[in-house]
Amino acid sequence: MNRIETIWFNGEWIYGRGDDGAAYRQSLLWYRRLMDASDAERARYEISTIGIHWPELDVDISFESFLYPEAEPSRIQRFFLTHEEINVSGFARKFGLNPSLLRSYVNGFKTPSKRKEEEIIRLIHKLGEEYTGV
Protein backbone atom coordinates (compact mmCIF):
# COMPACT_ATOMS: atom_id res chain seq x y z
CA MET A 1 0.00 0.00 0.00
CA ASN A 2 1.36 3.39 -1.01
CA ARG A 3 -1.61 5.54 -0.09
CA ILE A 4 -5.06 5.51 1.46
CA GLU A 5 -7.78 6.43 -1.04
CA THR A 6 -10.92 6.50 1.13
CA ILE A 7 -11.58 6.59 4.87
CA TRP A 8 -14.46 5.81 7.21
CA PHE A 9 -15.04 5.65 10.94
CA ASN A 10 -16.59 2.99 13.15
CA GLY A 11 -16.60 3.41 16.92
CA GLU A 12 -13.11 4.18 18.12
CA TRP A 13 -11.48 3.18 14.81
CA ILE A 14 -10.51 4.95 11.61
CA TYR A 15 -10.41 2.70 8.56
CA GLY A 16 -8.75 3.32 5.25
CA ARG A 17 -8.98 1.58 1.89
CA GLY A 18 -5.51 1.43 0.38
CA ASP A 19 -4.59 1.74 -3.27
CA ASP A 20 -4.01 -2.02 -3.11
CA GLY A 21 -7.71 -2.60 -2.29
CA ALA A 22 -7.02 -3.77 1.27
CA ALA A 23 -8.67 -2.24 4.34
CA TYR A 24 -6.48 -0.92 7.15
CA ARG A 25 -7.38 0.47 10.55
CA GLN A 26 -5.98 2.15 13.61
CA SER A 27 -7.37 3.31 16.92
CA LEU A 28 -8.71 6.83 17.24
CA LEU A 29 -7.34 6.85 20.79
CA TRP A 30 -4.07 7.99 19.20
CA TYR A 31 -5.90 11.00 17.71
CA ARG A 32 -8.03 12.40 20.52
CA ARG A 33 -9.20 15.53 18.66
CA LEU A 34 -10.36 13.38 15.76
CA MET A 35 -12.07 10.94 18.13
CA ASP A 36 -13.97 13.77 19.83
CA ALA A 37 -14.83 15.53 16.53
CA SER A 38 -18.31 15.62 15.04
CA ASP A 39 -19.13 13.71 11.86
CA ALA A 40 -19.12 17.03 9.98
CA GLU A 41 -15.63 17.91 11.29
CA ARG A 42 -14.34 14.45 10.43
CA ALA A 43 -15.69 14.82 6.88
CA ARG A 44 -13.56 17.91 6.22
CA TYR A 45 -10.21 16.31 5.43
CA GLU A 46 -7.61 16.46 2.69
CA ILE A 47 -5.60 13.57 1.26
CA SER A 48 -2.05 14.49 0.28
CA THR A 49 0.85 12.48 -1.09
CA ILE A 50 1.90 11.38 2.42
CA GLY A 51 -1.27 11.25 4.49
CA ILE A 52 -4.61 12.60 5.59
CA HIS A 53 -5.01 16.06 7.12
CA TRP A 54 -7.88 17.70 9.01
CA PRO A 55 -6.99 21.43 8.89
CA GLU A 56 -9.71 22.54 11.34
CA LEU A 57 -8.68 19.92 13.89
CA ASP A 58 -4.93 20.21 13.26
CA VAL A 59 -4.67 16.42 12.94
CA ASP A 60 -2.45 14.52 10.53
CA ILE A 61 -2.34 10.77 9.94
CA SER A 62 0.37 9.38 7.70
CA PHE A 63 -0.38 6.56 5.30
CA GLU A 64 2.55 4.70 6.84
CA SER A 65 0.87 4.68 10.27
CA PHE A 66 -1.88 2.41 8.91
CA LEU A 67 0.84 -0.23 8.42
CA TYR A 68 2.11 -0.18 12.02
CA PRO A 69 1.77 -3.62 13.61
CA GLU A 70 0.15 -2.39 16.84
CA ALA A 71 -3.15 -0.84 15.79
CA GLU A 72 -4.73 -1.63 19.17
CA PRO A 73 -3.32 0.24 22.18
CA SER A 74 -1.96 -1.91 25.01
CA ARG A 75 -3.78 -1.96 28.35
CA ILE A 76 -1.43 0.68 29.76
CA GLN A 77 -1.75 2.88 26.68
CA ARG A 78 -5.53 2.52 26.64
CA PHE A 79 -5.75 3.54 30.31
CA PHE A 80 -3.72 6.73 29.95
CA LEU A 81 -5.19 7.63 26.55
CA THR A 82 -8.75 7.37 27.91
CA HIS A 83 -7.98 9.06 31.25
CA GLU A 84 -6.31 12.31 30.23
CA GLU A 85 -7.04 13.69 33.69
CA ILE A 86 -4.29 11.43 35.04
CA ASN A 87 -0.88 12.91 34.36
CA VAL A 88 1.60 10.22 33.29
CA SER A 89 4.57 11.89 35.00
CA GLY A 90 2.60 12.55 38.18
CA PHE A 91 1.43 8.94 38.27
CA ALA A 92 5.01 7.72 37.77
CA ARG A 93 6.38 9.93 40.55
CA LYS A 94 3.62 8.89 42.96
CA PHE A 95 4.49 5.23 42.56
CA GLY A 96 8.28 5.53 42.20
CA LEU A 97 8.43 4.79 38.47
CA ASN A 98 10.69 6.47 35.94
CA PRO A 99 8.48 9.16 34.31
CA SER A 100 10.37 9.14 30.99
CA LEU A 101 10.16 5.37 30.75
CA LEU A 102 6.43 5.32 31.54
CA ARG A 103 5.81 8.01 28.89
CA SER A 104 7.75 5.84 26.42
CA TYR A 105 5.46 2.91 27.24
CA VAL A 106 2.34 5.08 26.83
CA ASN A 107 3.57 6.59 23.54
CA GLY A 108 4.58 3.20 22.14
CA PHE A 109 8.30 3.97 21.85
CA LYS A 110 9.13 1.14 24.25
CA THR A 111 7.34 -2.01 25.35
CA PRO A 112 7.36 -3.07 29.01
CA SER A 113 8.22 -6.61 29.98
CA LYS A 114 5.25 -8.73 31.02
CA ARG A 115 6.33 -8.37 34.66
CA LYS A 116 6.63 -4.56 34.39
CA GLU A 117 3.27 -4.32 32.61
CA GLU A 118 1.61 -6.31 35.41
CA GLU A 119 3.26 -4.05 38.01
CA ILE A 120 1.94 -0.91 36.29
CA ILE A 121 -1.57 -2.41 35.99
CA ARG A 122 -1.42 -3.27 39.72
CA LEU A 123 -0.48 0.36 40.48
CA ILE A 124 -3.38 1.61 38.33
CA HIS A 125 -5.71 -0.59 40.39
CA LYS A 126 -4.12 0.77 43.58
CA LEU A 127 -4.85 4.32 42.40
CA GLY A 128 -8.45 3.30 41.75
CA GLU A 129 -8.71 1.90 45.28
CA GLU A 130 -7.41 5.20 46.66
CA TYR A 131 -10.08 7.09 44.70
CA THR A 132 -12.86 4.85 46.00
CA GLY A 133 -11.71 5.47 49.58
CA VAL A 134 -12.70 9.14 49.43
Residue spans for each PLM region:
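Motif-centric detector for short Cys/His coordination patterns
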Residues: 1-134
